[in-house]
Regions:
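Short gly/ser/thr-rich secondary-structure transition/capping motifs
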Residues: 2-7, 23, 79
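Metal-dependent phosphoesterase signature
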Residues: 66-88
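Two-metal-ion RNase H-like nuclease active-site motif
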Residues: 19-28
Length: 194
């Protein structure tokens, strides 16, 4: 194992030993007006801490539903972000997050919190600082040159397949994506696939 891969393995092990929470969201889209429609948080043992649909402030576009399968009918009676913000923040402050594509999910958490006037609490302030990006660690492990911070970014399902991590449930649903992220970090902690 190279020094770089040993360091990557050590970081992955540390995230697992620190009992970080693995988080994933599904959203109404990619833009500045997108918001969260599903969130899942699991611990490093795979225990589900929170797994819920989230009722957005506007209808879910058909393009987003085509990706994750979440419809307006499914979220009709779901809690709003305001209802779950405190629980998510509490878990964040206690454990910190590991996220596959942290920049995206932290932006969507902030955007969704802002819709409810919750963007100025400590949670949103520290979100980027205490969130580790599994995608960047994996990109560094693979070492393929790319235009994003020097490395090629790999889709979650592709990274999982390369590391021999099976998909439990439907990809592009928050629980399945959390489990894939945990599986990738577990694989990296053990040295990762060549």
């Amino acid at each position: 194992m190279s020094i770089t891969n040993a360091t990557i393995s050590q970081r992955a092990k540390k995230w697992l030993e620190d009992d970080r929470i693995f988080i994933d969201t599904e959203t109404t889209g990619l833009g500045d007006d997108a918001e969260i429609v599903e969130i899942c948080l699991i611990d490093s043992a795979g225990f589900i801490m929170l797994n819920t649909l989230v009722k957005p402030t506007k209808p879910i576009p058909a393009e987003a539903t085509a990706i994750h399968g979440i419809t307006d009918e499914m979220v009709m009676y779901a809690p709003t972000w305001k209802d779950i913000h405190g629980a998510v923040a509490s878990l964040f402050f206690e454990y910190g997050f590991v996220i596959y594509n942290a920049d995206y999910d932290t932006r969507l958490i902030y955007q969704t919190a802002k819709l409810y006037g919750l963007e100025n609490d400590g949670f949103c302030y520290f979100l980027n600082e205490r969130s580790a990006c599994a995608m960047m660690l994996y990109a560094e492990h693979r070492g393929e040159p790319g235009r994003f911070k020097g490395y090629k970014w790999h889709k979650l399902v592709d990274a999982a397949a390369h590391e021999g991590v099976s998909v439990e449930g439907k990809a592009h649903r928050a629980l399945a994506d959390c489990r894939m992220t945990l599986g990738i970090i577990d694989a990296l902690a053990k040295g990762g696939a060549a």
